[in-house]
From Swiss-Prot:
Pfam families: PAT1 (PF09770)
Residues found modified as N-acetylserine: 2
Sorted UniProt keywords: Acetylation, Cell cycle, Cell division, Centromere, Chromosome, Cytoplasm, Kinetochore, mRNA processing, Nucleus, Phosphoprotein, Repressor, RNA-binding, Translation regulation
Family of the protein in this entry: Belongs to the PAT1 family.
UniProt organism field: Saccharomyces cerevisiae (strain ATCC 204508 / S288c)
Gene that encodes it: PAT1
Phosphoserine modified-residue sites: 456-457
Deleted gene: phenotype: Increases the level of stress-responsive gene mRNA during osmotic stress.
Protein name: Deadenylation-dependent mRNA-decapping factor PAT1
Single Gene Ontology BP annotation: deadenylation-dependent decapping of nuclear-transcribed mRNA
Sequence ranges of Low complexity compositional bias: 165-192, 406-415, 434-450
Keyword Magnesium: no
Length: 796
């Protein structure tokens, strides 16, 4: 215990301690050979020497640097010797402290008089030190109880300040006195200064410690200013202390800039103390976890307890609403959170056009829930409706009775560059897009003209396709091309039967795929005739993959020029003839079958995106959707892309640029259809006219629901919400029609007289009713909904 001043050997002196006797200057030497003797240095009964040094400003080399790094001009002495030899009275030489190397500021440590007050160091304040004659008189000695009471008061006053770390070199002791730190070196901030408690055996008057503000140096220079065991040098008189008014007086000596910073610091402290303790750390942790949970949750509505209670209360009040009202309420309820089915949505391949959406819905029902995490990581949770930016994201402001709380959204960067789609096109390196922007790559003038014109304008100007034939060389020229192609096909088939080598170069040239001398490509006009349509399967038998891909690119590039598109659109042909309807069925049976077969067996994801991109950029998509053929072609592309994307996600083949490219192309497609989706449903007069021609009592609109299901299947939650909002009336119209057929079925089933005609009509009604429900549920199941027992509910 001799290190702390408690000498058990009884060697304490009775007289005052002479500093010159206690200091032998060992700190000035570079190598001190006795400090490593711990038994002699820290021993209990060993004679303690005076060679224990904490630093000496006069020493050179590392010792001097260490002292300089502390920023305090401490003098070299031995605390062990000082405490061991006893406490002496004040020195009587009367020399004042004249510089930082004067040893008289250390006089009080060996004196029996009270220690001097702690004075601010020259580095920590810009105010001059007060003169000795300005010191206040000594205060009466306080008892230990008074000191502890003052300490508790000070701790309560500054309990909300962040405490500094305990200074190294100071022993741990009783509760520390806390002082507000004044701004030093232009860095305001609350801190605490804890002076070391006196040793138990030393008669030191603790009341002489200043209780006012004490300026403590902070880190304001490259070398941190720390505190050491020795007090800072300064003009301090041994028996005097700095008055409380000195700190206030030093504030007046601060520069205006420092005073402004001091006021700002005080304002910050008051603001912090005003709300201090308002929330406990547990409360803050709960709020943080709740906010983060709203970001990553898969189903925020179903996981919200308050929304579940609200939903139960609202359902309890429904007693007198009609059946349709219940259906609408159920639909609106689920459209907020279950509509998108973004965690149940799946991307399934469709090998044939008629079965592609059915397969997708089947797999969507049976698909395991493990893909929820994958789609959550893909970030398919953004909404584009009314939103407000906040710290954590965007909060939806569309609140209603079925959306009682705000939904937190994560902001996403959307490309604002109008040429962003062009950059996406450049990424399709595996597709020859050079010829897709125009009718040919050989003529730049024709390419510019092709980009400027709207291809659908020809369709609106002439419904019978005569204009397109004239722009491709005339009807006679097109018929001659068809005959030439037939001759080449016959020669190739003859060579194939004879086992000879086949060369399809002449046939390829006869198709005029790369001919740029016409506004409308002659190959497109060849498909206006039944003979040209029927020869296509035989043509594909002698083409390689690149040639087949070029033909498909040409078809999708000039899709609006196809006469079959004009004939199958209710806008250009509101009252088609029976011959025209048969031609539409022929094209669908042959050409669509060829396209589906090629895309299913020989195409990749990049090529399908290229075809869809050409369709979007060179055609009026909203006009194509009014045509049965155009709607089926778009359905084939997006369904096949959904298949490849799904298969690739399992084997991790697709890269992030490819996924982002698909999202860009889909957004472009959806933008061209937005606010026009309801136009894909033909008017009632058009359907009645077709049913009269075909002598049917039921209009099959399965291709429309297949398109809607495929569009929703590949889209995100906000896309699906827009689709539902636009086709809501058609959904309820289909439900009403099915209910009407159900009532008619009940009426016929209760008739006592049964005949063969009655049974046939009853079977037809049952089939049509089930077909309506099947088509509607085909669309609803993609989004996790189902129409059953007179209401739209969640798909189990």
């Amino acid at each position: 215990m001799s290190f702390f001043g408690l000498e058990n050997s009884g060697n304490a002196r009775d007289g005052p301690l002479d500093f010159e006797e206690s200091y032998k200057g060992y700190g000035e030497h570079e190598l001190e050979e006795n400090d490593y003797l711990n038994d002699e240095t820290f021993g209990d009964n060993v004679q303690v020497g005076t060679d224990f040094d904490f630093g000496n400003p006069h020493s050179s080399g590392s010792s001097g640097n260490a002292i300089g790094g502390n920023g305090v001009g401490a003098t070299a002495r031995s605390y062990v010797a000082a405490t061991a030899e006893g406490i002496s009275g004040p020195r009587t030489d009367g020399t004042a402290a004249a510089g930082p190397l004067d040893l008289k500021p250390m006089e009080s440590l060996w004196s029996t008089a009270p220690p001097p007050a702690m004075a601010p160091s020259p580095q920590s304040t810009m105010a001059p030190a007060p003169a000795p004659q300005q010191m206040a008189p000594l205060q009466p000695i306080l008892s230990m109880q008074d000191l502890e009471r003052q300490q508790r008061q000070m701790q309560q006053q500054f309990m909300n300040f962040h405490a500094m770390g305990h200074p190294q070199g100071l022993p741990q002791g009783p509760p520390q006195q806390q002082f507000p730190m004044q701004p030093a070196s232009g860095q305001p901030g609350p801190s605490q200064f804890a002076p070391p408690p006196p040793p138990p055996g030393v008669n030191v008057n603790m009341n002489q410690m200043p209780m006012g503000p004490v300026q403590v140096p902070v880190q304001a220079s490259p070398s941190p200013i720390g505190m050491s065991n020795t007090p800072s040098p300064g003009p301090v008189v041994g028996a005097t202390k700095m008055p409380l008014q000195s700190g206030r007086r030093s504030k007046r000596d601060l520069s205006p800039e420092e005073q402004r910073r001091l006021q700002i610091r005080h304002a910050k402290v008051e603001k912090i103390l005003k709300y201090s303790g308002l929330m406990t750390p547990r409360d803050k942790d709960f709020i943080t976890r709740y906010q983060l949970s709203q970001i990553v949750t898969e189903d925020p509505y179903n996981e919200d307890f308050y929304f579940q209670v609200y939903k139960i209360i609202q359902r309890g009040g429904i007693t007198s609403e009609s059946n349709k009202g219940l259906i609408a309420r159920a639909y609106l309820e689920h459209s907020g959170h279950r509509l998108g089915g973004r965690y149940k949505r799946t991307d399934i391949a469709l090998q044939r056009m008629q079965s592609q959406v059915e397969k997708a819905v089947t797999v969507a029902k049976e698909r395991p829930s493990k893909l929820k995490d994958q789609q959550a990581a893909a970030g398919n949770s953004s909404q584009d409706n009314k939103q407000a930016n906040t710290v954590l994201g965007k909060i939806s402001s569309t609140l209603n009775s079925k959306n009682p709380r705000r939904q937190l959204q994560i902001p996403r960067q959307q490309p604002s560059d109008p040429d962003a789609l062009k950059d996406v096109t450049d990424s399709l390196t595996n597709v020859d897009l050079a010829s897709s922007g125009s009718s040919s790559t050989g003529s730049s003038a024709a390419a510019v003209a092709s980009k400027q014109r709207r291809r659908s304008s020809y369709a609106f100007n002439n419904g019978n396709g005569a204009t397109n034939l004239n722009k491709s060389g005339g009807k006679k020229f097109i018929l001659e091309l068809i005959e030439t192609v037939y001759e080449e096909i016959l020669d190739l088939e003859a060579n194939l039967r004879n086992g000879q080598q086949t060369d399809s170069t002449a046939m390829w040239e006869a198709l005029h795929i790369d001919d740029s001398s016409y506004d409308v490509n002659p190959f497109i006009s060849m498909l206006s005739f039944d003979k040209g349509i029927k020869i296509m399967p035989r043509i594909f038998n002698f083409l390689d993959k690149q040639q087949k891909l070029k033909i498909l690119q040409k078809i999708f590039n000039e899709l609006s020029h196809l006469q079959i598109i004009i004939l199958s659109s209710y806008k250009t042909t509101p009252k088609p003839t029976l011959t025209q309807l048969k031609k539409v069925d022929l094209f669908q049976m042959i050409i669509l079958k060829i396209i589906v077969s090629f895309l299913s067996n020989n195409s990749n994801f990049i090529e399908i995106m290229g075809l869809l991109l050409q369709l979007i950029r060179n055609n009026n998509v909203s006009f194509l959707t009014t045509s049965k053929i155009g709607l089926n072609l778009i359905t084939i592309l997006i369904s096949r892309a959904a298949l490849i994307k799904q298969d690739s996600s399992r084997s991790n083949i697709l890269s992030s640029p490819e996924i982002s490219t698909w999202n860009e192309i889909y957004d472009k497609l959806f933008t061209s259809l937005e606010s026009k989706i309801q136009l894909i449903f033909p008017p009632r007069e058009y359907n009645d006219h077709i049913m009269r021609l075909q002598n049917d009592k039921f209009m099959d609109e399965a291709y429309i629901w297949q398109f809607l299901a495929s569009l929703a299947l590949s889209g995100k939650l906000n896309h699906q919400r827009i689709i539902i909002d636009e086709v809501r009336d058609e959904i309820f119209a289909t439900i009403n029609e099915a209910e009407t057929l159900q009532k008619k079925e009940k009426e016929l089933s209760v008739l006592p007289q049964r005949s063969q005609e009655l049974d046939t009509e009853l079977k037809s009604i049952i089939y049509n009713k089930e077909k309506l429900y099947q088509d509607l549920n085909l669309f609803l199941n993609v989004m996790g909904l189902v129409y059953r027992d007179g209401e739209i509910s969640e798909l189990k």
